[in-house]
Amino acid sequence: MDAIKKKMSAMKTKLEEADKQAQDAEDELTATLEKAAETEQTADELQKTLADLEDELDAAESRLTSLTEKYNEEEKKAEEGRRAHKELENRGQTDYSRLNRLETELAEITEQNEVVVEKLSELSSQLEENERILDEEEERCATADAQVKELEVDVVQVGNQLRSMEINEEKASKSNDQSANKLEDTIEKYNTIKDRADDAEARSRDLEAELNECDDELAAAKEAYGQSKADMDELLLELASM
């Protein structure tokens, strides 16, 4: 009987130990399940965090791409700005060189214009002088021509008087009633008129020579006037084409 009690007691003890082990195992399983649940929750949270990080990474990559594109655009604009600045510098240098060239050309044109104006003034004075000489020569030729015409009339009159005196002298020499004094007086008048006629002829020749000289001088004055006018027209044409 005691053996049975001992055996039952041993079995009870084993049963209690088994129950305890089962309880411990259950507790451990519960703890493990709780830990697994916590781990799963943590995994979910980590998964969510990872997804958020991936979204943030995508957003960051998108922003980086946008910033890269913007940087490239800004760099392109900066390069264009540097190129434009360089072109402006080159253009500025070109414009400066062109300005210097234009200033030099302007100075040359101004100097040429001053020379032309001075030459124009000289030609104008020369033209006025030639006009004055031409007027004087024309007046002189007109006066000489009038004197020649007057002498021609005078020569004709003296010739007529000489012929009349010769006729009277012939009549006087044929008339027996003419006195010697009247003959001498007639001869003296004849000589006076003849001298006057000779003088008129000499003066006529001188005036004709002077008239010829005057014509030559008038032609020379007209030629000089024409040349001065041609020079003036040519200079004005050059001045207009500048």
Curated annotation (Swiss-Prot):
Keywords: Coiled coil, Repeat. Belongs to the tropomyosin family. Expressed ubiquitously. Pfam families: Tropomyosin (PF00261). Gene3D superfamilies: 1.20.5.170, 1.20.5.340. The gene is TPM1. The molecule is in a coiled coil structure that is formed by 2 polypeptide chains. The sequence exhibits a prominent seven-residues periodicity. It comes from the Eukaryota. Residues 13-23, 70-96 have a biased composition (Basic and acidic residues). Residues 1-242 form a coiled coil. This is Tropomyosin-1. Homodimer. InterPro entries: Tropomyosin. Residues 1-31, 65-96 are annotated as: Disordered. The keyword Transferase does not apply. It comes from Podocoryna carnea (Hydrozoan).
